[in-house]
Every structure is written in structure tokens, then in C-alpha cells.
Amino acid sequence: MIMAEKVRDLRSALERLKNMPGQLAETDVAVDPMAELAGVYRYVGAGGTVKRPTKEGPAMIFRNIKGHPDASVAIGVLASRKRVAALLDCEPENLGKMLYHSVEKPVAPVEFQGSPPCQEVVHLATDPDFDLNRLVPAPTNTPDDAGPYITLGMCYASHPDTGLHDVTIHRLCIQGKDELSIFFTPGARHIGAMADRAEELGQKLPISISIGVDAAIEIGSCFEPPTTPLGYDELSVAGALRKEPVELCHCVSVNEMAIANAEYVIEGEVIPGVRVQEDQNSHTGYAMPEFPGYTGPASDQCRLIKVKAVTHRRNPIMQTCIGP
């Protein structure tokens, strides 16, 4: 499969989809991120998550987000094998083999040289008007959700003892103007182990959350043990998939790195000794829709991230999905 422009970030990915008939829909109609955006996409896209036969619908860009005049929201970018294969320069029938072999030939990330795109605009938590709800157009998919969810945030952190890095995707809910909850599946995720060790040491764990990246990074971030054991940086898988290293930059407010070509980066620290109720604002008892088709229960064991900064590109594109 030969494509014109190489996919290196979300914007080049969307440009590629524009050139594929039926794979991307755009709208300038105003849409509310509170329970409306996801509902629209359910009907324009592939429908419900468990309906059979499985349908293929287009990805979608919402250009007019209520409350966020300078931002757009992209959804469903990875919602079909055909799209994922196209974004990775692969035939759909060879996608599984490509993912398998990517672990065998990792390409380590490198440091970005110059001014990173993700830091074109910087908001510090010390700014008087700082508010995650205003800065990040995270959708609330249903009225029962615990709050606005970041479903495609690439969480990047380092082990307190070894300094080894890891990237994973976790469910993140905006809890306040400078607070996020993060859910770690017990015993299953690398950054959860890092946060546990930092807590044992009585330390905060610096973390960056990069939103709006290319498909290789998102898919690489989903690799888990035993395929990629603790200490294996999954950005090396992404590098193998995209056939060039992922570029990282230094955060502006915490001692950690972030993905330089991301649309948004949220910087913060996982606070030791603190657990929060996921639905502490909505009191619905639910978290968010899960991919099998049900709404998952809210956790009372979420860790708390105290946000220190939000950086983003000019006219940023929030990337999301319905369900994790």
C-alpha cells in the first residue's frame, strides 16, 4: 500500500482519511460535548458497540464545539481495521502480523529538537483562569457518565527506582479545575506499578498525558504484559510501526517527557495516599460506557492527578472514542 504523505501526527492522519472515500465526515454544526457529541457519532459512525453484524462507519470531526471556540473534536479515527491499516501503511489482512513483529524490532523514542508543536500555547495551573473544563473539550458520552472523560490520553511516566519509561492509556475523568482521576486496573498496568512504588516512597509521580497523536502511538500504547513486560517502553513499538522514532519533549511544569507532536498535553503529578470516588460530582454510580456495550460502575479507588499545566497546538484537535 503506497500513500502520498507519511502519517506522523493526528493532522496528517486526518488528511489521509479525507482522501479515502467514505472514511471521514466533518461538520460545522454546533454540538455540545455533554452527551450530544457521542450521540451524533453513534448514528453517523458505526452504531452501537455490540450490534452484529459489525458495521463500518466514517471517522468524524466536529468543528464547532460549544464552549470551546478554538478547538475541534475527532472521534472514531481507529474504529475500523481498514482505517488502522491505511494509517500504518499496511494491508488490512497483514495488520496482525505487523503488530506481532513490531515488538521484535523496537525503535526507541528520541528527543525533539527545537520548539515542540504541543507547546505552541501554554496554560499553567497558577494562572487565575486555569480550568480543565474550559481548556480541554473532553466529551461526556452519556448523561450517566461520571463526568467528562479523556479516553485517548497517552499516559507517560518513569519508574521511581529505575527511571525506565512507560506509556499506557487509562480512563481519565475531569474532577475539578486542576484535578483528574485516573483508574489503574489492579496488577495489570505498568504506570499503576510506578504509582504504587512512588506511593511506597511517599513521592508524587510526575506524569504527562498526550492527546491527539498518530495511530502507531495509540496502538503501541495498548500493548501490555506479558508481550511487553515492566520496563519495556511501548513507544518503541510505536516507533517500529511508524518506521521512525517517536519524538519526545520536556514538560514545562513537571520532570517528565511528553509526545512532541500531540495536540494536547496535560502535565501533572499522581498524589500518594489519595483515592477519589470517580463519580463524586455526578453521583450516578457509573463511570463510562465500556466497549462490550454496558456502562461500567464508578470506582472508589481512583488515583488523583494534580494538574500543573495544559499545553496544546494552535486550534487543537481533541481526539476521543466512545468507550475505552
Regions found by a protein language model. Give the residues of each.
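Extended, highly charged
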Residues: 2-304, 308-324
